[in-house]
């Protein structure tokens, strides 16, 4: 399953932002996979922190092969040591089992997250061990498919914005200017900023000042 968007969102963004309109026309529709199972999405994002996408995919495949369905029962039955054997660090395995325990004993209302506003959902998710604000926002986008997520703390988003809008730096004030312009479809804009940052359009440059080499 891919992040759902279509003509309505594209038309709105292109009308609001000429430079982004050019990017959208060049790239076309973007397919980004989503995981609509909130429990497994939280675990998947914890695993992926500070490792490559390839390493994350390898560990995730091992986990799926080993346990099949990823839920609180299978995680708690596995325990920290078995999770470590899959290539997960001790600290992350602790975060994962703590999350599973909270879901199991209902001290974390995982179903209730879906009913909350973006701000409330981010606050709830980032109260979990191992989940910061940036990770919570990624869960909102790539699991819950919330339509208006744009993260200032995402370095690739900042890079993409510099490349699209020809800025040397994206400070908070500039970021908020674009966020307001692209709202309520910031999530779709995020997909294009990530694509640009990743080199989807050859020849586009990053306008960030080059770092001075130390003598």
Regions from the language model: what does each represent?
Residues 1-30, 119-120, 133-142, 146-215:
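C-terminal accessory module of base-excision DNA glycosylases/AP lyases that mediates lesion recognition
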Residues 42-47, 96-100, 139, 189-193:
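Short alpha-helical scaffolding segments that buttress acidic/His motifs in well-ordered protein cores
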Residues 39-43, 56, 76-79, 118-121, ...:
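N-terminal alpha-helical segment
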Residues 19-23, 51-52, 56-127, 181-183:
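Alpha-helical ds-nucleic-acid-binding substructure associated with the helix-hairpin-helix region
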Residues 46, 79, 83, 107, ...:
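Short amphipathic alpha-helical interaction patches enriched in hydrophobic/aromatic residues
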Residues 36, 40, 114, 149:
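Residue-level marker of regulatory loop/turn positions in helix-turn-helix DNA-binding domains and
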Residues 8, 15-68:
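A positional/architectural concept
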């Amino acid at each position: 399953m891919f992040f759902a968007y279509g003509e309505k969102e594209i038309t709105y963004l292109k009308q609001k932002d000429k430079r982004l309109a050019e990017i959208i026309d060049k790239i076309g529709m973007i397919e980004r996979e989503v995981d609509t199972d909130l429990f497994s999405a939280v675990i998947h994002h914890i695993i992926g922190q500070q490792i490559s996408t390839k390493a994350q995919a390898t560990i995730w495949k091992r986990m799926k092969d080993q346990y099949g369905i990823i839920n609180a029962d299978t995680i708690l039955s596995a325990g920290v040591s078995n999770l470590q054997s899959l290539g997960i660090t001790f600290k992350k395995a602790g975060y994962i089992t703590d999350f599973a325990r909270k879901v199991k004993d209902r001290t974390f209302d995982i179903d209730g997250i879906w009913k909350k506003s973006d701000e409330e959902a981010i606050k709830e998710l980032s109260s979990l061990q191992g989940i910061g604000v940036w990770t919570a926002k990624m869960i909102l986008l790539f699991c819950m498919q919330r339509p208006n997520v744009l993260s200032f703390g995402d370095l690739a988003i900042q890079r993409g914005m510099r490349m699209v809008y020809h800025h040397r730096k994206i400070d908070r004030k500039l970021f908020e200017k674009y966020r307001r312009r692209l709202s309520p479809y910031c999530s779709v804009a995020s997909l294009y900023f990530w694509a640009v940052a990743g080199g989807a359009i050859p020849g586009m440059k990053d306008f960030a000042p080059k770092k001075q080499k130390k003598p």
